[in-house]
Amino acid sequence: MTRDIGKRLQQLKARRSGTDRMAVLNSTDGLDVLAKSIYGESYTRRATGQKHTQYALGAMQAVDADYTRISLAEAERVGKQLDAGLRARGRDVGFRLQGSVPCDIHIRGVSDVDLLVLDEAFFTYDTSGSRARAGQFNSPVAYTPLSALQSLRSGAESILKDKFPQAKVDTSGAKAIKLSGGSLRRPVDVVPSHWHDTSDSQVTWRETDRGVRILDKSIPESVLNMPFRHIERINQRDAQARYGLKKAIRLLKNVKADAIEEGAKIPLPSFDIASVMWHADLGALAAGSVYELAIVAEAVRHLDYLARNAAHAKTLLVPDGSRPIFNTAEKFEALIQLSLEMDDLAVQIGREQDRLLHHVQPSLRQVEEVLRRSVVPN
């Protein structure tokens, strides 16, 4: 498969600036995105003449804070309309965000934001938890949680169509109602759900230990997620890694996106990519606070090790501890493909940083050593 670094740099710029998703923007915001895209980001003025290095530097960076602010503001705006509409129907709801945007590991300037709409009238719980065993949960509701979520979804769909008449309200998804266009400056995914008190949260009383059950209307059933624990644990390890973990996650997500554009099949979800790097060497990632390309080196080493040690890889859990990362054979095959993509990128960066590598077919270990000691001028 041919890897075109010039094309990948263009695609990276389009993703980060939002010009890749003009179709979901209204005309005013489309013009704003186009205008802002004319001015290159700081990474485009570094490593000039070293395209692979420049790509890695850009792929690791957080999306412009102004883009993220707009995404969060639009989610809040949608939440306010839903809150008013649902309360008028006698429903008490709460709102939280989940996913890549609140975790700051999104790679698109125009990113969908996941807005949880939580039915506050009830919650479910682990019957093995301490509060449940003590008999503290003794006021059952007269309806099933699943029927409540189905009703919540129906009400939310109706309200969104009424409050955002010019927007596209896509209700075909199993878990999310997707809004885009019209007066919305960014796409918002509305996810009907309710709280679930886990055994842990019954002890700690911390919201990050609470789960949420999300409606999957295609079955129908509710699915337990732990989005707040996931975000907290990514944030904790990122701080321990001197903010190198999130850079590594963004890098892998960008490489995956560009490889797919070129025809590769890498069915490894963003959640699992973050989970993979959560298990990387934090000290090696922390070195990226001085030697930025050390983050590339650790991502390459870590993926290569897992790809060569399937038995170990399959023991690794997602950060919230709810399941193995590689719970399907397809995901492990995707890891191998992503590892090969990273190997190729690392070799090309290594050759840009050390001319001696032009004359040999270097081993990955040689490439990693070059990346760990390379300094890219600002």
Whereabouts are the PLM-identified features?
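N-terminal regions immediately upstream of nucleotidyltransferase
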Residues: 1-96, 102-110, 122-139, 317-323, ...
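Histidine-centered divalent-metal-coordination microenvironment in nucleic-acid enzymes
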Residues: 100-120, 178-191
